[in-house]
Amino acid sequence: MFQLELVNVVMHQRKAIEDTMRKKKKQQLHKFEMLPSPYDTAWVAMVPLPGSSSQLPCFPQCVEWILQNQQSNGSWDLNQLDSITKDALLSTLACVLALRRGLLFIGRNFSIAMDEQLAAPIGFNITFPGMLSSVIEMGLEVPIGQTDVERVLHLQETELKREYEENYRGRNTYMAYVSEGLGNAQDWNEVMNFQRKNGSLFNSLSITAAVLVHNYDAKAHRYLNLLLNKFGTAVYTKNIHRQLSMLDALENMGISRHFDGEIKSILDMTYSCWLQRDEEVMLDITTCAMAFRILRMNGYDVSSDDLCHIAEVSDFHSSHQGYLSDTRTLLELYKASEVSVADNEFILDRIGSWSGRLLKEQLSSGALQRTSSIFEEVEHALDCPFYATLDRLVHKRNIEHFAAMSYISYAQNNIPDELERIDSWVKENRLHELKFARQKSAYFYLSAAGTVFDPEMSDARIWWAINGVLTTVVDDFFDVGGSREELENLISLVEMWDEHHKEELYSEQVEIVFFAIFNSVNQLGAKVSAVQGRDVTKHLIEIWLDLLRSMMTEVEWRISNYVPTPEEYMENAAMTFALGPIVLPALYLVGPKIPESVVRDSEYNELFRLMSTCGRLLNDVQTYEREDGEGKVNSVSLLVIQSGGSVSIEEARREIMKPIERCRRELLGLVLRRGSAVPGPCKELFWKMCKVCYFFYSRGDGFSSPTAKSAAVDAVIRDPLDLAAVVASQEPIYIIPAS
């Protein structure tokens, strides 16, 4: 496990402290600074000098490091957490073996070894008793009662008996993986079958060193030599896995944008290893799955075919992680399976199927303790796919639940001001006077603040929310609030635009709705035209006209009882889902210049089509009953009609989920593809809105419900991060991602 120090962020000193935090983190990430592994260092220290009859150390610098780094509590636990872990016991016992001294810490904390409620490194019940036996054989005085010693040694006996009795395909792999604890009972020639091209065993320093303790091997010796030349007096484990874990932690807490250059270095290095099929990446299932997911989500071209060696559940069970049904590995595999970008990525589908099934079995069987963090991680992953939640909810959950760090995006400080501007806009435009209109400013601001959260994106958030509120009013006007004459009058007024005074206003309702559109488009047009360096107001008007005309088509279908073909319906309905006025203007406010050629590019239109289709179909699946009662058709009812009644409503809903899945995958693929016409930050906005649609419609009609998403509103908008204890302490906070 490694630590990454983050300084506290105090609200009233936010700018100075943010700068300090950023500098420190950049230094650490740039140098890939991680704490040494006392456990691995101890095993390397035990490697004898080849040909030495007096058991002189081959790597005396590691012995010196152990001598210099015993902590004040007697351990070699560099993490310095409030509570002692099994990992600390294991590391300390290994250092005891290397130095033949320092057993007081083990004696004081021996009960931890027997506590089944505590998390333990893989193979702890074999390696810890095995090393304790070695300590006793050396004649060192162990400050532990004989009964307790026997209880711990019995752990290994029971574990070995169970392992041999069950005899799964991964048994040999697992037994090789816990070689440090087996000593002379191990078949070291059998272990050498797992040696990799670089000379290591499982890319593990401790296992490789354990081999050299019992048998000399030139390749293994060369591997350790190379690492000692690189690191100096101590060694570190699984470099790529740790760096990816660090990167993942930064992204999950929403602060990765501060370290773009450093993160790119890690990603480029990992991608190079991926292309070379480096064993450190490809042969460790956890690292392989994590690397695939992170590389793909950062736009690197990685094929799911490269996961063919772990496509089947039998491949998993043949590994040491699979032999133990390791939850962390299963979770990484499941998360990797979710980043599919095409309908034909069957390997990801298979991985997702069996890893999800095994995770559900672990939850239901009680194999995971309900109070453990991994239980909640698994439950959350199965319950809430990454494409169905808002980024800010993920960030807050990781920061608060795992007590990882004290950090708060300063976008949150802008929330009261931004909400006030939106509420003022609603009142200034008299939208609150329209009795037929749903008031959804909180939900639209939630969708904006939950996805477009960087401080400099304030205008994008505000106009995303304003246009969302306005499209809802217009949608309700066309659905229930306006007569045909009023709707035709509204469209005519928008078509005339600056010459609208030549057209008579049919009603006060038309007046309110039209001038809300007119004033907002002109105000936004002036702002984005200044940002873009060209007049884009005409484009904003076109966006609204496309929406209004499509909505009118639906009205005419309803009035005439016309049943459109599925193709006619989808072409029109994707537009009437009304994401155009929300997303497309916001593209102008997220940074890049967008020339007219990009707006007319086929990729731009395809991004919009996929996003809108996905949102519309998700909405259709959840709102069928309400819309049917209003005399409106949607994709669900059309499928039933087209089948002549042979398809039930539930069957139709399940069938509609297939094109939803396909559109989502294609959209993600298009967003992640490099070298395209539409700038990356703009493409990301289409994906963010797709996630918003899933968030509101993956389980019922969360948008129409006044309470379904109230907890999310509270979490993102109303409730600050729970940092009181952290800020009060003013102590450094440590991040410790799972190993």
UniProtKB/Swiss-Prot annotation:
Domain of life, per lineage: Eukaryota
Annotated cofactor note: Binds 3 Mg(2+) ions per subunit.
InterPro entries registered for this protein in UniProt: Isoprenoid_synthase_dom_sf, Terpene_cyclase_plant_C1, Terpene_synth_N, Terpene_synth_N_sf, Terpene_synthase-like, Terpene_synthase_metal-bd, Terpenoid_cyclase/PrenylTrfase
Residue numbers binding Mg(2+) 1: D475, D479
Residues holding Mg(2+) 3: N619, T623, E627
Tissues where this protein is expressed: Expressed in roots and stems.
Classification via Pfam families: Terpene_synth, Terpene_synth_C
Cofactor requirements of the protein: Mg(2+)
Keywords: Lyase, Magnesium, Metal-binding, Plant defense
UniProt xrefs under CDD domains: Terpene_cyclase_plant_C1
A single BP term in Gene Ontology: diterpenoid biosynthetic process
Residues the entry annotates as binding Mg(2+) 2: D475, D479
EC number(s) reported in the record: 4.2.3.-
Gene3D superfamilies with a match to the protein in the record: 1.50.10.160, Farnesyl Diphosphate Synthase, Terpene synthase, N-terminal domain
Family affiliation: Belongs to the terpene synthase family.
Protein name as it appears in the record: Ent-kaurene synthase-like 3
Organism, scientific name: Oryza sativa subsp. japonica (Rice)
Gene that specifies this protein: KSL3
